Design a protein with these regions (language model features):
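Scaffold signal of the M16-like zinc-metallopeptidase fold and its non-catalytic homologs
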Residues: 84-85, 128, 135-136, 144, ...
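Structured mid-domain segments that build the active-site/substrate or prosthetic-cofactor binding neighborhood
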Residues: 287-365
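C-terminal regions of mature proteins
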Residues: 21, 215-217, 369-480
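Stable alpha-helical elements in mature extracytoplasmic
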Residues: 69, 73, 90, 94-97, ...
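Sec-dependent N-terminal signal peptides
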Residues: 3-12
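M16/MPP (pitrilysin/insulinase) zinc-metallopeptidase core fold and M16-derived inactive scaffolds
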Residues: 54-119, 162-164, 183-189, 300-318, ...
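His/Glu-rich zincin catalytic helix
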Residues: 15-93, 130-132, 202-313, 351, ...
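Acidic/histidine-enriched alpha-helical segments
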Residues: 139-158, 223, 242-256, 323-325, ...
Length: 480
């Protein structure tokens, strides 16, 4: 019955225009997109069912853009924007206003973007936008608060020192191509930011905080006309320096004809195997989504699947995989396997089985039914699922406004226009042993080094013999 439903949905949605928003009959929301004269792209969503109003600004700058001698500067600047503007110099003005109207705010710095967001009761939305917009027009960067906020960044860093996934991520960055920005330490601490000057903050701000590199999302019960008026009134003063989009070296991981293994000693009792492959950027392939197709095939759990085989052997408990972009220029495909104790002892057999399964995927033709099922489920979700409200939805939309064509923003996850066997096969071409690094995380693994910032113990080894084994394709009857 489920398959019949999916097939029926494919027939119904197959000829739909991918730009058309699929809506439930009772969905009375309205959307409008505008581009202000300063180049700022704006997405407006009005919904009478919302309980709160929310806004988000995404800026195309992140930890990859940190100067070599100022690791963490993008994150530090994110903190500093909350500490007063020329129009509202009181450092507590913004947070107090939001609190008085039942709201709050947040921000984060990622690899290639920074996002600021808030939510508030509808009656306080206009005033909140006035205060929020000044972050991007006239921040003070007051010297007296610099030391305080460096300590706040350092506290955030210290809080995460024992976080295994931050430790693993940091160690992984040590093995990308030498000199690539992926090697940079993103969070920052007293060591990297301790003597940062106001002029450094201002220069970084002027270099990257340009209206044409931003996306704004406003979500509220207020009308589209009201919100467009406020967007123009409060955000048109953001300066447009006509900065070009960031470009990063797509070759962030050098190919090497050997099996590369990183072993990490975790804080918690984790047993996990991660196999990663460097990819060109796939963000522009959002209409064909080859990474989702790859993940759907890899994550299949039924008879003949990789996970069912690993479970039968007593080696694995869980498996997840997929592919995506870190930036417009590069990304990665990865497979994460939760190991049993026996699987830990036989991790090479797990790696070999995984590569044999991937080779089987490669030898089969592109499976259009996978794309059609993903498309059908996405259409169902777009029509019937609750998309939520508040600042986290605003955050997602603002990021999409910044990263994708504005006409598709707000529904990137729902767009499945063209299955594109070419995109899918090109992705698979990068899933090779010479483009691979394997990370084994478990208590008791062999380690002989310590990472500087997190003091995490790890080791790195190469194995040419096992690499040659991986190149030999085994046809396993269990995968049929």
């Amino acid at each position: 019955m489920k398959n019949l439903l999916i097939i029926s949905l494919v027939i119904l949605v197959g000829c739909e225009n991918s730009n058309k928003i699929m809506k439930h009959p009772l969905d009375n929301s309205q959307v409008r997109t505008v581009v202000l004269e300063n180049g700022l792209k704006v997405y407006l969503l009005s919904d009478p069912k919302f309980n709160v109003s929310s806004a988000s600004v995404a800026v195309e700058v992140g930890s990859l853009d940190n100067p070599k001698d100022r690791e963490g500067l993008a994150h530090f600047l994110e903190h500093m924007l909350f500490l007063g503007t020329e129009k509202f110099p009181d450092v507590d003005e913004y947070s107090t206003y939001l609190k008085n109207f039942g709201g709050y705010s947040n921000a984060y710095t990622s690899s290639d973007h920074t996002n600021y967001q808030f939510q508030v009761l509808p009656d306080g939305f206009k005033g909140a936008l006035d205060r929020f917009s000044q972050f991007f027009i006239s921040p003070l960067f007051t010297e007296e608060y610099t030391a305080r906020e460096v300590n706040a960044v350092n506290s955030e860093y210290q809080k995460n020192i024992m976080n295994d996934y931050r430790r693993i991520y940091r160690i992984s960055s040590l093995f990308v191509k030498d000199g690539h920005p992926e090697q940079k330490f993103g969070t920052g601490n007293l060591e990297t930011l301790g003597n940062t000057s106001r002029s450094e903050l201002l220069n970084f701000y002027k270099e990257y905080y340009s209206a044409n590199r931003m996306g704004l999302a406003l979500l509220s019960t207020h009308s589209l006309d009201e919100m467009e008026t406020w967007a123009r009134e409060y955000f048109s003063e953001i300066k447009n320096y006509n900065k070009k989009r960031n470009e990063y070296d797509p070759e962030f991981f050098e190919k090497k004809e050997t099996f590369r293994l990183v072993q990490v000693e975790p804080v918690k009792d984790i047993r996990e195997l991660s196999i990663s492959f460097a990819l060109p950027g796939t963000r522009q392939l959002y209409k064909s989504k080859p990474g989702r197709q790859f993940g759907a095939i890899l994550g299949h759990e039924g008879k003949g699947s990789l996970l069912s085989y690993l479970k039968k052997e007593g080696w694995a408990l869980t498996l997840s995989g997929g592919a995506g972009s870190t930036t417009n220029d590069y990304g990665s495909a990865s497979i994460r396997i939760g190991l049993t104790k026996e699987g830990l002892d036989n991790y090479k057999k797990v790696v070999k089985a995984t590569m044999d399964y991937i080779n089987l995927i490669k030898t089969n033709n592109h499976p259009p039914h996978i794309f059609n099922e993903l498309k059908a489920m996405a259409s169902l979700n777009e029509i019937y699922s609750s998309k939520g409200e508040g600042m986290w939805r605003a955050t997602t939309i603002a990021n999409e406004v910044m990263m994708y064509p504005i006409e598709d923003a707000g529904r990137i996850n729902f767009i499945y226009k063209d299955s594109s066997p070419k995109d899918y096969e090109e992705l698979l071409n990068h899933i090779t042993p010479d483009n691979m690094i394997t990370t084994l995380v478990a208590k008791g693994v062999e380690v002989d080094k310590k990472e500087h910032f997190y003091q995490a113990s790890y080791s790195y080894t190469e194995d040419k013999g096992f690499y040659n084994e991986l190149k030999v394709v085994n046809i396993r009857s269990e995968f049929s």
